[in-house]
Regions:
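FIC/Doc superfamily catalytic core
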Residues: 1-191
């Protein structure tokens, strides 16, 4: 437990440092660089794309797993999602419509799960820095206070089980981003 606490403290300090920097490049390379800078010395694979396929038993899915990108398609999938987002215009969208789109982009990037560990924290830092490029005031506080909800919202945004009537939805992620960006006060519950 002590090693986990030390890791969390190191990474938390690095998150604060990265978010304090006024630098950003919208690219897959930036995502990899953020991961490396967050986890260097913590994970030996910091900043490197995972070389194997994964599944993770999720509490919120009663032990089922999201289907993540195959390891041999991560680079191409990231490039596709970034290209698609670069082509998207936020011009003429309300802030609420922008929140909905940002939630979808965030869930798409997270679903790729390019790293062995640290995907949610890396995605959070990347998305905060990306949102700031739109002039949005974003802090890590809502992410830190509701990190488990954020992760579960990402899981639900990427999970389908038609047999049980479950469809992927960004609804919960939109509530999270609405609290973050629109000063709403939705109750963020994991159940």
């Amino acid at each position: 437990v002590q090693a986990e606490t030390k890791e969390a403290d190191i990474v938390s300090a690095r998150i604060a440092m990265l978010l304090g920097e006024r630098t950003f490049q919208f690219s897959p390379v930036e995502l990899l660089t953020i991961h490396r800078r967050l986890f260097e010395g913590v994970f030996e694979h910091a900043g490197r794309i995972r070389p194997y396929n994964i599944s993770k038993r999720e509490w919120v899915l009663k032990g089922d797993s999201v289907i993540y990108a195959a390891c041999d398609s991560i680079k191409d999938t990231l490039e596709y999602d970034f290209y698609t987002e670069k082509q998207f215009s936020y011009e003429g969208l309300s802030l609420q419509e922008s929140v909905k789109h940002l939630a979808k982009f965030t869930s798409d990037i997270w679903q790729i799960h390019p790293f062995c560990e640290g995907n949610t924290r890396t995605t959070a830092v990347f998305v905060i820095k990306y949102m700031k490029t739109f002039g949005l005031e974003v802090s890590n506080d809502v992410f830190a206070e509701h990190s488990w909800y954020f992760r579960n919202a990402l899981v639900r945004a990427n999970y389908n089980n038609l047999k049980n009537g479950i469809h992927a939805t960004t609804e919960y992620l939109e509530l999270f981003f609405s609290n973050l960006l629109l000063n709403t006060n939705y109750e963020l519950k994991n159940r």
